[in-house]
């Protein structure tokens, strides 16, 4: 009888983890996942220098933005970041 109760409790805990876990809920904020798809696309083509780089930390439709050279413009990296 005790084994049956332990088994039932274990199953409930495992099911609770699967169905109630925040990582599986599809919810979340941008702070939970820094590479989550964001629409910072307004920064694509923005002027960037070493001193003023608006591309840092920006993501456009799953592609991270970066400044290829000093005194250039923000472009998207070719590597896709799943989000």
Curated annotation (Swiss-Prot):
Disulphide bridges: none
Tissue specificity field: Expressed by acrorhagi.
Keywords (A to Z) from UniProt: Amidation, Cleavage on pair of basic residues, Disulfide bond, Nematocyst, Secreted, Signal, Toxin
Coiled-coil stretches: none
Signal peptide: 1-20
Post-translational modification: Contains 3 disulfide bonds.
Keyword Kinase included in the entry's annotation: no
Propeptide: 21-36
Residue(s) carrying Proline amide: 82
Functional description taken from the UniProt entry: Toxin.
Protein name listed in UniProt: U-actitoxin-Aeq6a
Compartmental location: Secreted; Nematocyst
GO terms for MF: toxin activity
Classification of source organism: Eukaryota, Metazoa, Cnidaria, Anthozoa, Hexacorallia
GO annotations of cellular component type: extracellular region; nematocyst
